[in-house]
Amino acid sequence: MTVEASGEAPAATRCGFVALIGAPNVGKSTLVNALVGAKVTIVSRKVQTTRALIRGIVIENNAQIILVDTPGIFSPKRRLDRAMVSTAWSGAHDADLVCVLLDAKTGIDEEAEAILAKAASVNHDKILVINKVDLVQREKLLALAQAANERMPFAKTFMIAAISGDGVDDLRSTLAEMVPPGPFLYPEDQMSDAPMRHLAAEITREKIYRKLHQELPYQSTVETDKWEERKDKSVRIEQTIFVERESQRKIVLGKGGATIKSIGADSRKEISEILGVPVHLFLFVKVRENWGDDPDRYREMGLEFPKE
């Protein structure tokens, strides 16, 4: 057994997967980013922006916490919807711990009720995380926590405001204590298992949603076609935004190309900040009819293609 200079044996490491499940827009992606301390997943006012399982990686004391940000769980209508919901529940069943998020303002509505009922069948310790507590009076929060715990037993209950970070440190510390003993699965300086090409595409997709949240429906996706690291340390990135109809392509381009220029500028700025080097971003918009029914697109997003 190795012994440190202090004469004490080094603390045994812990490592585990923690799945975050909940209704769309409950704040899962914001919480992942707050726990990690950096942006690893897309955040938008628009529901259903997370499509695949994105892992954020946190080191807390002697523990490595691998966060699985699942797509929001809802009643699926399209093929893409069904794939996203299936992915979310797979992430919950495969994890070591499950955090069930509730929106403090919405409470236990029909959507949350269905999630709680199904989450009860997951055979792992479950933690109740009530988010957006800054928007609700304390008495209502206590009643909500009690109502949720009556529906299923939670190992712990946390009340947080992910967007401001209130309560996040306590949650992180508890997750570190609850993940099982084991060696780290990722390098200590790694914050996500998503390739940078993928994260760059997600950042551009987020900017599209922020800019066009009223006009553009969900039938759009972004792919990073080219990633070139140049001699001057800058990075040249080419991305294609795919939409399903010509009318959508015109919306993304905007009058005189103004909209696509604005999206590109916002995306380039954020990617550059993350990489710490200048970024030259070139965006193209193409029509790919019925891409939502193409199995190859699902594989690229890390989703299983549902037969029907």
UniProtKB/Swiss-Prot annotation:
Which residue intervals make up region (G5)? 160-162
- Cite the Era-type G domain residue spans from the record: 14-181
Q: Where in the cell is it found?
A: Cytoplasm; Cell inner membrane
- Look up and give the membrane topology term: Peripheral membrane protein
InterPro entries, per database record: G_ERA_dom, GTP-bd, GTPase_Era-like, KH_dom-like_a/b, KH_dom_type_2, KH_sf_prok-type, P-loop_NTPase, Small_GTP-bd
Which Gene Ontology terms cover its molecular function? GTP binding; GTPase activity; ribosomal small subunit binding; rRNA binding; small ribosomal subunit rRNA binding
Which stretches make up the KH type-2 domain? Answer: 212-289
The record's Gene Ontology biological-process terms are: ribosomal small subunit assembly
Q: Where is this region: G4?
A: 131-134
Name of a matching Pfam family: KH_2
Q: Where does GTP bind?
A: 22-29, 69-73, 131-134
- The record's region (G2) falls at 48-52
Q: What do the Gene Ontology cellular component annotations say? A: cytosol; plasma membrane
> Origin, by domain of life?
Bacteria
Q: Does the keyword Repeat apply?
A: no
- Per UniProt, which keywords does this protein have? Cell inner membrane, Cell membrane, Cytoplasm, GTP-binding, Membrane, Nucleotide-binding, Ribosome biogenesis, RNA-binding, rRNA-binding
Residue ranges for the region (G3) are 69-72
Of which family is this protein a member?
Belongs to the TRAFAC class TrmE-Era-EngA-EngB-Septin-like GTPase superfamily. Era GTPase family.
Q: What does this protein do?
A: An essential GTPase that binds both GDP and GTP, with rapid nucleotide exchange. Plays a role in 16S rRNA processing and 30S ribosomal subunit biogenesis and possibly also in cell cycle regulation and energy metabolism.
Any idea what this protein is called? GTPase Era
Q: Which organism is it from?
A: Bradyrhizobium diazoefficiens (strain JCM 10833 / BCRC 13528 / IAM 13628 / NBRC 14792 / USDA 110)
Q: What is the lineage of its organism?
A: Bacteria, Pseudomonadati, Pseudomonadota, Alphaproteobacteria, Hyphomicrobiales
